[in-house]
Amino acid sequence: VAFAIALSVAPLQARSQPDRLAQLRERYDKETDPVHKAKRLVPLGNAEFDQIEKQIADGDQNGALNGLRQYQTQADSVEKALDARNQNPERHPGGYKELQFSVREALRRLDNLVVSLTSDQQQPFLDVRKDLDNLNRRLIKELFPSQPTNSK
């Protein structure tokens, strides 16, 4: 019985994933407050990476790369909007903290994806990864500016 239920629910979940992604994107796009936008990026980023992973599994590297670039654009725009508020991220971490969580998770998931690609396929993904890593480092530095820096 449980197996039959699982089989009947699986198509619904597969169908609802694009709907969920569209709903999350719509809520993200409508949000005007940078802190709330950063908070909305967390579930949106997870849903986008679910889609990216599926595209990689289906052999659609171009679609996956476009999705990854879209995530990068969203993360960059949230950072710019947060910075435009001219508030100290160390004292007012709202938004920065959520953005850093999302970017860190994106980097982790991207690292897991890249190993499944050929070296030729990896390069454009690694280019985006480098930009996301730079964003992550900036966010950490803004959130924790008084921490000693590693002089490597």
Name the predicted role of every residue range.
Residues 1-10:
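Bacterial N-terminal signal peptides
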Residues 14-152:
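Long, charged/polar, soluble alpha-helical segments
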